[in-house]
């Protein structure tokens, strides 16, 4: 049997269901390239030393190490930060296991999407979609964040922007994410990602971070650390507006 288990976005988010699945497993695998993971908590729960899987292990080799464990009739778990099913690589492993006739269970965890909207007090019903702010590849910037934010602002919807992760596991800090958006504005030039654009930054959830509300220019000059996500708010209801004013006031006292 294979269990895909989410540990939540940081320390203190492990559910009872997640803990039980890990304790009962013969083989415990984890990856930390899609989201940060509380490895020490994982070690306390596992019966043996957890095995770290790389992006290549999961995506290029289709989780071969996991299936070697399953072939021996053992219980395997793949543990991730956040929720296990928000990454396409994890969904691919689940689908492959089912095709090969193995029982599969999913143990949900607190996702960064839910955490971001909880901490910002914005309505998740107005989420218009998710895009990733990526580092340029070969000098080319992805315009997907620009296009999605532009569409959502026209429709009165909020946009969640995930921030990139380098191959070495380094999470893009908010300052670099803001700089990428400003560079996109220089290239696209439709007046969207200006320095005065208001943005919510949710950073280091479960690792001593919180949420701040500031302008894109202020974020580009900040020293906030990753991992982080941005929310570009659109039309605000009265409660949303009051919540963001509170975040802005708290941010100004830092």
Swiss-Prot record:
Keywords: Methyltransferase, S-adenosyl-L-methionine, Transferase. Its EC number is 2.1.1.98. One of its GO terms (molecular function) is diphthine synthase activity. It catalyses: 2-[(3S)-amino-3-carboxypropyl]-L-histidyl-[translation elongation factor 2] + 3 S-adenosyl-L-methionine = diphthine-[translation elongation factor 2] + 3 S-adenosyl-L-homocysteine + 3 H(+). Belongs to the diphthine synthase family. Homodimer. This is Diphthine synthase. It comes from Pyrobaculum aerophilum (strain ATCC 51768 / DSM 7523 / JCM 9630 / CIP 104966 / NBRC 100827 / IM2).
